[in-house]
Amino acid sequence: MRTSPSSQLSLHGVTKRYDDRVVLSQVSLAISPGEKAGIIGDNGAGKSTLLRLLAGEERPDAGEVTVIAPGGVGYLPQTLGLPPRATVQDAIDLAMTELRVLEAELRRTEAALAEAATDEALQDALTAYARLTEQYEVRDGYGADARVDAALHGLGLPGLPRDRRLGTLSGGERSRLALAATLASQPELLLLDEPTNDLDDRAVHWLEEHLSGHRGTVVTVTHDRVFLDRLTATVLEVDGRGVSRHGDGYAGYLAAKAAERRRRQQQYDEWRAELDRNRRLAEANVARLDGIPRKMGKAAFGHGAFRARGRDHGAMSRVRNAKERVERLTANPVAPPADRLSLTARIATADGPGEAPAAELDGVVVGSRLRVPKLRLGAAERLLITGPNGAGKSTLLSVLAGELSPDAGAVSVPGRVGHLRQEETPWPAKLTVLEAFAHNRPGDRDEQADRRLSLGLFEPEALRLRVGELSYGQRRRIELARLVSEPVGLLLLDEPTNHLSPALVEELEEALTGYGGALVLVTHDRRMRSRFTGSHLELREGVVSGAR
């Protein structure tokens, strides 16, 4: 693949709304050829919307989007838009639409060459064939299928049959299939929405190496902080309907945000101090005026009386000036740095049976997916479960949650369990955020709204939004809110960082440090794993291969 010096992306005055909700307003930005940019922001801020605009999947309501990429565009959405009856080959063809179109045009041109009745028709067909062949070779179309196999192997899906139905694949397998096919199409411009979701360590490492060697432009939405550090030089933050650009990668973004917050705090502190000083000045001089008699007898009109009246006029002037400054400062307030939506709840621990284990497994077998001879989890123990995709991690959590009965063995979990699943709950699209949160929960509507708002995960107006209007990250917040709003003795977290913003992941980590019950964590987030303190269990092909 060759990159074009004219390849670029730009937005000029772009506004995008859904019904009456404005997601992006007057956004302008440019991305240079060969640039590797990460898009971050709060859940629902408009990250995926921005990527869809760049991919041409949606059109702006105002403004202009320009994408010049003669070498093609590869777009990876968060979900594969094909029905369960579709095949693996259908998914590959969808990701390689541009190449498949070129192949079809080549076949039509070959037919035109064979059927040309005149020299002029033959020359036209030869010219078209040469042009199409050059385009196809630039994309290395002849090696595309081999690249699919290589990418599937790198992402942990070797030998996937092309005729296999998508409905027989897990959500993670479908995501990796779509990613492999998108990369194999070898476009000049890659637009990737959460590409590291559902990838184990080996697959993420392969992806980082592949994208680092990509000679074109990469724009990716991701919550993976290590991935941002290693791949991107530019960070685009979507916030408050706008997009801001930061250099020096994710570390540079964090430093810039911290400096900006300090600057805003200093400006607010200075404004507040000046306002308070002038209010005190006005009040002090009013009190001084009150101490000077308004009327004096004739005997008082001496030298001292003129000094008193002079002080009187001076105090009045100071009061007037101070009041004017207070009015100006009040009319032009300086806002303090905004507090981001964050997880403010403390995850409560349910009362359990004293020092009894939170969970015990003995001789557990689940088909060919899981074999656990013995596992004991203390009342306040923390356990990190790792292993490649398909190792049985989610199966083990489902057994601990009581959602999956083993074929053999005994399971004892005496306390209350909270389970954050990897797969999202299929809430009806017409439910509001508040209705989804309150589903099967005691308490009236106002009480549920207060509980929801106290968690800090949604603004008040967001409680009225329909589930169908939410981003993946916002729907994940519903699950997180339901989890942390009830006390539990055993907390099971299956890929809790999926679809959450980096800032919220930090808040979740902080909330977990204050949780006093037993915790079992499955995560591909390398930074979360590096900060984890507790026991470690490794699974491979459903069998415990290591523990410490």
Curated annotation (Swiss-Prot):
Locations listed in the record: Cell membrane
Pfam entry (one): ABC_tran
Keyword Membrane: yes
GO biological process: response to antibiotic
GO molecular function terms listed in the Swiss-Prot or TrEMBL record: ATP binding; ATP hydrolysis activity
Binding site for ATP 2: 387-394
Key words of the record: Antibiotic resistance, ATP-binding, Cell membrane, Membrane, Nucleotide-binding, Repeat, Transport
Main location: membrane
Role summary: Responsible for tylosin resistance, and is proposed to be a subunit of a multicomponent export system for the energy-dependent efflux of tylosin.
Family in the record: Belongs to the ABC transporter superfamily.
UniProt-recorded name of the protein: Tylosin resistance ATP-binding protein TlrC
